[in-house]
C-alpha cells in the first residue's frame, strides 16, 4: 500500500510538471496574476489617465471662481478649502440674491441661510438650513461635517450650534429687506407658494385656511422663476490632480418662501453630490423640484452605470421635465477624469464658470449651454459656444 501511494504521488507530480512546462512563461505569469490584473482594470481602467485640477461654479460669477481656484492651486488636497472659499466669496460679495443683496426674505421678512458641503472620498455630508443670524453658513455646514455625527442641522438650533463654536450672531435684515417685502405685500403678495386655500392666494395675502378637498384645483403649475442675476443659490465643485472631489452649495432661500421651508442646498443629492469613484454634480434651479428628484445624485449614479457626463446631464434634465414640464434650472456633471458637461431647461441659456481642466483654455472662463425648447421636451444637451464636445481620446474607458 505504501509503495502504491508513493507511486501515485510521483505520477501526479510528473503530470503537474509536464503541464507547467508546456505553458509559456508569459502565460504562467498571466494566470498567476490574473485576479490582481482584473482588479486593477476594474478600478483604474487599462490606461492611466492624467487628471487636471478643475474648479466649476454655477452662474457667471468669475471673481468667486478665481478665489476658489487660487486656493485649489495651493497644493494637494485643497478641494474642501477651495469650495468653502468660493461660497464665502459669493456670500460676502453681490452674487445674485445671496445675503449681501438682502433681497430674499421669507414672508415674515426673515433672512435665513442654508449651505452644504460633501466630501467625495468619505461621502460625509454637512449642512444647515433655515439658519438666521450667522453670515457664512458654509462654515457652519463644514463644522457639522467635521465636529458632529449628523448631516443636517436646522433653524434656531443651527444658529445655537454656530454660536457654541464661536461664530458671531448678527441681525441680517435691513432697510433693503424691508423695502423688498413692502413692495411684495403692496402687490397682493405675488408671487407666493400657497395653493388650495381660502382666500385665493393668487389675489390675497392671507391669512389662509384650507379648502375642502373636493374644491382643490389643479391649474398648470408655474415653477419658481430662475433669472440670470436674480437667483438665490450657488454651487461649487472642486477636483484635484489626485482625483479628490468636494462640492458645496450656499443659498439664501427662495424669495418670499413660507417660513420654515428647507431648500435644495441642504438636501443631500439635490443641489450637490460627489463620489471619488465616479465623479460629481451640482444642480441649480427650482429647489422644491430638485428635492423631489435628487438630480445631482442621479447624475453621479448615471455615470456609475456607464453614462458619459453629457449623457448623464441630459438624462437628468429629461427626468425632471417628464414630471415637471415647466422646470427651470440646470445640472453640471463631472466625471472622475475631469470631463464635464451640462444641460438645462427653462432658460435661454445657462452659464457656469470653469477654471482648469484638460483644455486649460483660460481661468474663470464662462461656459454657456443653450437650453431646450420646451415644446420639444427633448434635451439637445451638451456643450455650446466655448464648451467643446468631448474628444474621443478624453472619453472614460
UniProtKB/Swiss-Prot annotation:
It holds the Pfam family Asparaginase_2. Disulfide bonds join 90-95, 189-205, 344-371. GO terms for molecular function: N4-(beta-N-acetylglucosaminyl)-L-asparaginase activity. Belongs to the Ntn-hydrolase family. It comes from the Eukaryota. Keywords: Disulfide bond, Signal. GO terms for cellular component: cytoplasm; lysosome. InterPro entries: Ntn_hydrolases_N, Peptidase_T2. This is L-asparaginase-like protein CG4372. It comes from Drosophila melanogaster (Fruit fly). Residues 1-22 form the signal peptide. The lineage of its organism: Eukaryota, Metazoa, Ecdysozoa, Arthropoda, Hexapoda.
